[in-house]
Amino acid sequence: MLKSKYSDGFFSIDKENGFLPLAEPLRQLPEAYTDLQTLIDQMPIEREDGSKGLLHTEGAFEKAVLQIENHLEQVKSEKDPFVRAALFRAYSFVCSAYTLAPAHHHFIANGTYGKAHRTVPKNIAQPFAEVADQLGQFPFLDYHYSYSLGNYYKINPDGGFNWENLGMAAKFSGMSDERGFIMLHVDINQYSPQLIEGSMGIVHAQDDEEMNHHLELVGTALKHMNARRRLMWEASRWKHYNDFRVFIMGVKGNTDIFDEGLIYEGVWDEPKAFRGQTGAQDNIIPTADIISGVVDFYPENQLTQYLMDLRQYRPVCVQDFLKDLKESSTGSAGTIARLKASNNQKGLQLLLKILEEIYLFRNGHWQFVQKYIMSNTAYPKATGGTPITSWIPNQIKAVLSAMTTVDQLTEDGAHGFDKKEWKVRFEKKVQLLNKQLEIVQVPSFNPEDVFKLNAALGLNDA
Ligand code: HEM
């Protein structure tokens, strides 16, 4: 049964808050953690006042980390969800910066990542594992509590959620491209309340009118999200992605950097390997995939397993929401099946518009990967540990398959639907992907050849 709200006291997945926290996250830790807060403030390569921070100088951050008091007992007594979230954020930043600092300096000197430190010191590992346990999370930098949604503050408190008005409470590089990159994720989520309202409305709709109203709501939310997403090209310059990328790398899947894992001193005897921070932990596309039925077209392969694995890297309340949403929209309760059963032609067309937005999101996102990653580095693994060139396009194929199925149910001319025109646009999408996949199959391919095709077929995102 789908509930109207899913909350852990920090997030509340409902039509008021969407996927954003209930209120602005704490910018600073409580006084008992002053040494830790000072470390966070002094950490970025470039600090707020323009001076060089600890990560700028090789070895300086690691030295400072060892001076921090072990706050394990204090952390055990914390009950406030906002304090817990801010502590998780602080410790996860310290953990990633500490372990990956050598890889960062190796990259600056040699252009390759080199090795990370393999041990998280006890004074960080123990309180981090404790707060992670309280939140039901793995002790590693994540998207919700750490790097993105739980890491913003409004520069002008009366202003909105556009990325220009958002600052990062904790940062690695401290440069404007890092802020633009991750705060745009928060910005895009300002439309998630409508996405939730529409999705819940679709599940509960009693007739075509209610169904179509909520399909329209989802389509409009996704359209706004796509318009904001496209601003990535200016919010964060692709050539500067490597300034901060190394710090969000995960352990799992990145054995070149971390070997067989990380030792959490004083917590576990054996090494652990958790996945890294990635937009793949965001909830917009998973929600849209479930409600539109794209999820039923996911290929049965390792990528799908990876996306499902990432469910565990989300707050428990988000996991519950996605699980219930899926259970409420499966089989004959699925949106496509219900639209087919009532031959709701208007609804089918609204669903095609939703699928178009999911396609534009994924195709634009694939172009991010081509430019921000493939044009910048030969390292083929993403921060989440996936082989990027083969996996990302796979999900575009799932969208194209869902589109074909829905198109087969639509009638030419119903409510002015022009099937022929739709087909022409659809074929371009298929052609683009096939040609791009052909290029990336050659081991020494040139990323620019992949990117140029987007404009050639009129599907350029920038
Ligand atoms: C410069 C911008 C971006 C780059 C370079 C990028 C890169 C990537 C990469 C490499 C993956 C593969 C999985 C992994 O991490 O191992 C991925 C997956 C994903 N990313 Fe991003 N990403 C960007 C922006 C975004 C934004 C703004 C969102 C949404 C708010 C997002 C949502 C997703 C989703 C949902 C997936 C899972 C794959 C799918 O379902 O299609 N990404 N991203």
Across the structure, where does each feature detected by a protein language model lie?
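Surface-exposed peri-terminal alpha-helical interaction modules
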Residues: M1-A462
